[in-house]
Amino acid sequence: MIPDFLIRAFLIQALRIRYANACFAMAVVAMTAMMPAPSMPQQAANGSTPSAGTVTFTLDFPQSDPEHYSIAIDASGHGRYECTGKVAEDSEEEAYRTEFQMSAGNRVRVFSLAKQAQYFTGAVDSSNGKLAFTGAKVLSYQDGQRSNSAHYNYSNLAPVQQLTALFQSMAATLEYGRRLAYYHRYQKLALDDELKRMQTQARNNELSEIQSVAPVLQEILEDSSVINVVRARAKELIEMGNSVAAGH
């Protein structure tokens, strides 16, 4: 039989161990509460995400139509087109704005060319005063760390030349979309000639991002009051835009 004093000693030791464990657990909780929370990026702490890059092309060319336009493309491919000009000869000059989603291939191309052009940090204009004026152009790049702009009439830099050609062909497409929406609403008889010109330029690879004007082309295609030849032209352009956007 175990003596009583040994039992009491055993119980006292067990209580001491439980007390020590409890104190240790409380100390761990207290130390955890005193530790600072893991740091977050400054943008997240401010409730916003890190800013992505945006490439913008602007053209100002008096006596042309439109006289002013700009196209901005962000890193996700979301595009915004703004212009000021007449949509038709007998219309008033007005501001116009539309948004679209750029094809993945051209989105990658835009940002690759911007990188090759060092995000427009250096001299871009050729400084050749003998060249004809073709409009005051600006290429700009903005992200969380940079905000650069380059002004030029003509550039000898291949990446800038390619960006200029791409943005101008996009603007031509978006202007077709603007005019088609106007003609569809007010002058349906003008649709055939307009779509015929658009088809010719598209077949000659003079237009980019045809899918960006697919909504107005679809409206024309589905309008039974429009003659069949016009609707057929709209359908062909929709298919061309879908093919290019899919990378075919």
Regions found by a protein language model. Give the residues of each.
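N-terminal post-signal-peptidase region of extra-cytosolic proteins
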Residues: 57, 66, 93-97, 119-125
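Charged, amphipathic alpha-helical segments
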Residues: 42, 104-127
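Bacterial N-terminal signal peptides
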Residues: 22-33
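N-terminal secretory signal peptides
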Residues: 46-91
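N-terminal secretory signal peptides that target proteins for export/translocation
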Residues: 1-18
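Acidic/histidine-rich, surface-exposed loop or edge segments in extracytoplasmic proteins
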Residues: 80-98, 196-200, 214-218
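A short, exposed loop/beta-hairpin motif centered on an aromatic-Gly-Thr core
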Residues: 94-101, 150-152
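Short, well-ordered, aromatic-rich surface patches in folded extracellular/luminal domains
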Residues: 37-63, 123-248
